[in-house]
């Protein structure tokens, strides 16, 4: 399901990222690269280990990244799903371009600020998996939609009050194109956003129908918020979602829609989404079954390693962790204690602490980081417990596996993309 998008060419918004100058803003990059453009530095194909990079430095595996992109393209295609990966994970336009090149329908956003960034980099299809009731943001969206007939935008609605605020802002803006919305079905009591009952959803749909500024095109939600989730509970909620789509269609609520959107899917239950969406009966119009997983692009060595649906369906693929945070041993004050120069400012820690994986000595030899455990993080230090007999010296580099892609990307503005031997071939720019 490939779509037209801004090519990564020198004159495109993404291509112009290569013209940005390397300087003090980008931690970990070689000090002697100051003043070079990102493209010039990439062309030098420096070694991550001997090319002057300073620690800590986060690197993305080129091989793992490409593997993950291909895996989810195959998976979504095999299950007849359109794919709008959640861009909040990386906020990296270069990765958006690669996701689109691998067949993505568009990119999912979480807040209006994301949408503005996506548009600055030429994204033509955006699914905002959230409510938007900010008048200033809605005025901007109205201008953007009116100025570009090819721009497709969809947002959640979950309350008549939200619909009222959207309608007022869009009327004030003089919007000429209706803004497409999907009714969000909440995942259950105590869950996040979303109308809680089918009756609540119908009331929201009625409110949309009463406006001239909004167009109801489908239903959506996030199964990851199902309370005490397991396969049975998640599938039961997903069947509520598809039943809502069938009911709304039977009531001709999608009469103005070019296609009917049914959307769900984080990174923990996309197998359940695929199963239940496959059961959806034929509706009155074409159906866009839209999956929105995001963490897959880098995967991880912690939380998502344990919860990925590919653990349940290994014959359909496997994701590879793409992140490695390299830090240096700066202190060994006690026999069982060492400190690395990477901390909360550098590594995700909201779900799990980093996992030591490899020790690299100054002479370039590498060995497994057996006997090392990260026990805590300070702002700029990792606390390492060192088992007796473990060889670890001040000056050694330690590779850390990370847990939770969303809070790994956000700590780095420019991330080296490295091949297996450490050759850096590109730099991924993020916009957090």
Descriptions of predicted regions:
Residues 1-143, 428-432:
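A charged N-terminal "starter" segment
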Residues 2-6, 334-432:
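C-terminal accessory subdomain/extension
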Residues 63-71, 203, 236, 240-243, ...:
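A non-catalytic, amphipathic alpha-helix used as a structural packing/dimerization or gating element
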Residues 65, 88, 118, 183, ...:
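Conserved, mostly hydrophobic/aromatic
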Residues 84-228:
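Active-site-proximal beta-alpha core segment in soluble small-molecule metabolic enzymes
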Residues 171, 186-311:
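Active-site loop/helix belt of alpha/beta enzymes
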Residues 270-359:
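Active-site loop ensemble at the mouth of alpha/beta enzyme cores that anchors a bound cofactor
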């Amino acid at each position: 399901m490939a779509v037209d998008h801004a090519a990564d060419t020198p004159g495109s918004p993404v291509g112009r990222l290569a013209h940005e100058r390397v300087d003090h803003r980008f931690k970990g990059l070689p000090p002697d690269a100051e003043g070079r453009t990102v493209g010039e530095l990439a062309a030098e194909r420096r070694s991550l280990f001997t090319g002057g990079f300073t620690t800590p430095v986060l690197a993305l595996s080129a091989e793992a990244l490409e593997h993950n992109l291909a895996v989810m393209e195959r998976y979504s295609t095999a299950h007849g799903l359109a794919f709008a990966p959640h861009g909040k994970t990386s906020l990296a336009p270069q990765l958006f371009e690669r996701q689109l090149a691998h067949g993505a329908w568009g990119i999912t956003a979480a807040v209006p600020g994301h949408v503005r960034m996506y548009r600055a980099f030429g994204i033509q299809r955006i699914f905002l998996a959230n409510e938007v009731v900010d008048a200033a943001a809605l005025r901007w969206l109205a201008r953007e939609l009116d100025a570009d007939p090819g721009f497709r935008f969809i947002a959640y609605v979950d309350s008549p009050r939200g619909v009222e605020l959207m309608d007022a802002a869009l009327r004030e803006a003089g919007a000429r194109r209706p803004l497409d919305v999907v009714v969000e079905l909440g995942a259950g009591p105590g869950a996040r956003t979303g109308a809680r009952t089918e009756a609540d959803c119908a009331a929201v749909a009625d409110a949309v129908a009463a406006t001239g500024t909004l167009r109801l095109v489908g239903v959506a939600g996030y199964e990851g918020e199902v309370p005490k989730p397991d396969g049975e509970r998640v599938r039961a909620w997903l069947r509520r979602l598809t039943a809502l789509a069938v009911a709304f269609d039977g009531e001709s609520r999608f009469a103005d829609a070019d296609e009917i959107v049914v959307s769900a899917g984080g990174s923990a239950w996309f197998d359940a989404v695929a199963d239940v969406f496959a059961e959806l009966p034929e509706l009155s119009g074409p159906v866009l079954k839209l999956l929105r997983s995001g963490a897959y692009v880098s995967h991880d060595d912690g939380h998502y390693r344990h919860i990925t649906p590919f653990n349940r369906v290994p014959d359909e693929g496997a994701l590879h962790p793409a992140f490695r945070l390299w830090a240096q041993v700066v202190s060994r004050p006690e026999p069982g204690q060492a400190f690395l120069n990477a901390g909360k400012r550098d590594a995700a820690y909201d779900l799990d602490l980093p996992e030591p994986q490899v020790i690299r000595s100054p002479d370039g030899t590498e060995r497994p980081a057996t006997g090392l455990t990260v026990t805590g993080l300070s702002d700029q230090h990792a606390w390492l417990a060192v088992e007796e007999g473990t060889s670890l010296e001040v000056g050694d580099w330690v590779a850390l596996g990370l847990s939770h892609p969303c809070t790994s990307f956000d700590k780095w503005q420019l991330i080296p993309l490295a091949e297996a031997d450490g050759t850096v071939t590109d730099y991924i720019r993020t916009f957090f």
